[in-house]
């Protein structure tokens, strides 16, 4: 894993669709407020995504760490005040103790909000996994990441894409020696459809449960290069213990 790759994924993910298409490959603009757990991490600008897991905690990717973060909830168009947003500063930001910035193993981070959010139809938590998602499970990935294959176009409106969990064998074959037990691949081995990572730290939700966190990958929609995500089902104990201790 190169440092260049890691840097490329922070803030807005790399997008390299096979087709000359200025949209996330296979993706679409999410119906307004259909992803109420999606958050935007902001430090004067949107730089990563995350997921609300209860009224005072957000989960994201550890490689999205900044010492000061404002969490923005209830967003759809992140460049317009629409009246449903809640902006809350982070009180605590906790990276997994075994996170590796080189291999991106254990790429998970918890953010405690300085005050609880007001839960409603447009701001609501997503459930943690009760079990790991088997290969073939269909998932929803969302984010405000770059939508251009050449250049930069960060969309105003939240983007969604549907993609399946791949087998661990296929994931390891796609990235020999780079996949750990804390990573899963989601996407299509044949290429042509992908989330283009959406946004680093953002959610992969399967059957109503948070199964993945946008972590890394090589390009987008390239054959044999699916997106790689933090395997959230392996971290439920750590999440629960960390919340209880803080």
From Swiss-Prot:
Enzyme active site: 63, 107, 200
Coiled-coil residue windows: none
Stored InterPro entries: Peptidase_S1_PA, Peptidase_S1_PA_chymotrypsin, Peptidase_S1A, Serine_Proteases_S1, Trypsin_dom, TRYPSIN_HIS, TRYPSIN_SER
Record GO biological process: digestion; proteolysis; response to acetaldehyde; response to caffeine; response to nicotine; response to nutrient
Main location per the UniProt record: secreted
Residue ranges annotated as propeptide in the record: 16-23
GO cellular component, one term: extracellular space
An MF annotation (GO) of this entry: metal ion binding
Domain Peptidase S1: 24-244
Sites marked Required for specificity: 194
Top-rank taxon: Eukaryota
SUPFAM superfamilies, sorted: Trypsin-like serine proteases (SSF50494)
Reactions the enzyme catalyzes: Preferential cleavage: Arg-|-Xaa, Lys-|-Xaa
UniProt KW keywords: Calcium, Digestion, Disulfide bond, Hydrolase, Metal-binding, Protease, Secreted, Serine protease, Signal, Zymogen
Cofactor or coenzyme needed: Ca(2+)
EC number: 3.4.21.4
Binding annotation for Ca(2+): 75, 77, 80, 85
Cofactor note: Binds 1 Ca(2+) ion per subunit.
Disulphide bonds in the chain: 30-160, 48-64, 132-233, 139-206, 171-185, 196-220
Signal peptide residue numbers: 1-15
Family label: Belongs to the peptidase S1 family.
Note, other: This sequence represents the precursor of the major form of trypsin produced by the adult pancreas.
Subunit text: Interacts with SERPINA1.
Protein name: Serine protease 1
Lineage, highest ranks first: Eukaryota, Metazoa, Chordata, Craniata, Vertebrata
